[in-house]
């Protein structure tokens, strides 16, 4: 009897918690989307992208535009050798 009661209790708990949990995850997703698309985060992403481009260009000894024109295999060979 205890197993059946435990099973019923778990099933009812799951049915009650699923909509509440879905609401929490929806709120987290919506809030994260707002933060990700905010102006300060866009500025930080831009700075990080520029820093990464400059680092790679310095590492391979080319300007960022030259690095963008290189074939991928050549680019990876240069990074592997240095």
UniProtKB/Swiss-Prot annotation:
InterPro entries hit by this protein: Antimicrobial_7 (IPR012526)
Signal peptide: 1-22
Localization annotation: Secreted; Target cell membrane
Propeptide regions on this chain: 66-82
Main location: secreted
Entry keyword set: Antibiotic, Antimicrobial, Membrane, Secreted, Signal, Target cell membrane, Target membrane
Tissue: Expressed by the venom gland.
Protein function: Antimicrobial peptide with moderate activity against Gram-positive bacteria and Gram-negative bacteria, as well as low activity against fungi. Acts by inducing bacterial membrane disruption. Shows activity against B.subtilis (MIC=4 ug/ml), S.epidermidis (MIC=64 ug/ml), S.aureus (MIC=32 ug/ml), E.coli (MIC=128 ug/ml), K.pneumoniae (MIC=64 ug/ml), P.aeruginosa (MIC=64 ug/ml), and C.albicans (MIC=128 ug/ml). Does not show hemolysis activity.
Written domain comment of the UniProt record: Forms an alpha-helical structure in membrane-mimicking environment.
Similarity-based family: Belongs to the non-disulfide-bridged peptide (NDBP) superfamily. Long chain multifunctional peptide (group 2) family.
Protein name as catalogued: Antimicrobial peptide Smp43
Provenance organism: Scorpio palmatus
